[in-house]
């Protein structure tokens, strides 16, 4: 796995390219993310690094969490994430990963949680067609048939019905980095990314599905 970075979604806006065309972009606060732990084959059986993100007050973390972070000389951090790496050479505890790891024109994968919708109905959750809305119809937003009768005498598992939707982990692949603001640790990525403003994101260099990173 390639080493990525954690960030938060700030929102969407648009910028203009050299030809004057408007480009929709998402602004991401990417890092800084200090390395909080380095794992090696000798000590843990595999090579990996753990990074932290989003500084918080000490009272918001437990004593074991604070002790773990203090070993790396890191401040109290809300989120921790691990990346597998082929080698840990050149990586040090406390080393900060910042937005300048990426460059304009680079392809990235962005992982996050979609906006939660709560308990939703058939149309909103699955895109079912509604019934007639005219006078006399009693089937405006009903689901229709949920199966046969006595045989099988039950609703099959997996039947699309009303229920909780959203707040699912998803990855948007192959997004283009339009601009990098290294001074403010901002990434401008073309298109939309999962979640609402303030949502936690995992940004990694793009990989082809099935390709060994």
Curated annotation (Swiss-Prot):
Supply the alphabetized keyword list: Ribonucleoprotein, Ribosomal protein, RNA-binding, rRNA-binding
Gene3D superfamilies in the cross-refs: 3.30.160.810, Translation factors
What top-level branch of life does the organism fall under? Bacteria
Q: Name one GO cellular component term.
A: cytosolic large ribosomal subunit
Cited InterPro entries:
Ribosomal_uL3, Ribosomal_uL3_bac/org-type, Ribosomal_uL3_CS, Transl_B-barrel_sf
How is the quaternary structure described? Part of the 50S ribosomal subunit. Forms a cluster with proteins L14 and L19.
Q: Which HAMAP family match?
A: Ribosomal_uL3_B (MF_01325_B)
Q: What does this protein do?
A: One of the primary rRNA binding proteins, it binds directly near the 3'-end of the 23S rRNA, where it nucleates assembly of the 50S subunit.
Identify the NCBIfam families for this entry. Answer: L3_bact
State what protein this is by name: Large ribosomal subunit protein uL3
User: What is the species listed in this Swiss-Prot or TrEMBL entry?
Assistant: Synechococcus elongatus (strain ATCC 33912 / PCC 7942 / FACHB-805) (Anacystis nidulans R2)
This protein's gene is called: rplC
């Amino acid at each position: 796995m390639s080493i990525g970075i954690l960030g938060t979604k700030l929102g969407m806006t648009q910028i203009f390219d050299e030809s004057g065309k408007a480009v929709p972009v998402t602004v991401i606060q990417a890092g800084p993310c200090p390395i909080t732990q380095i794992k090696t084959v000798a000590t843990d059986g595999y090579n990996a690094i753990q990074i932290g993100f989003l500084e918080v007050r000490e009272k918001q973390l437990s004593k074991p969490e604070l002790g773990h972070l203090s070993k790396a000389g890191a401040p109290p951090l809300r989120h921790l994430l691990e990346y597998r790496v082929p080698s840990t050479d050149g990586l040090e505890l406390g080393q900060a990963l910042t937005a300048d790891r990426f460059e304009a024109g680079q392809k990235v994968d962005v992982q996050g949680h979609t906006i939660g919708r709560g308990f939703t109905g058939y149309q909103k959750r699955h895109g079912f067609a509604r019934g007639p809305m005219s006078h006399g119809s009693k089937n405006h937003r009903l689901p229709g048939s949920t199966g046969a009768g006595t045989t099988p005498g039950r609703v099959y598992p997996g039947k699309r019905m009303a229920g909780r939707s959203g707040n699912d982990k998803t990855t948007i692949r192959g997004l283009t980095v339009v601009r990098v603001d290294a001074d403010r640790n901002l990434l401008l990525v073309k298109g939309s990314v999962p979640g609402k403003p303030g949502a936690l994101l995992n940004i990694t260099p793009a990989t082809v599905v099935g390709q060994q990173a």
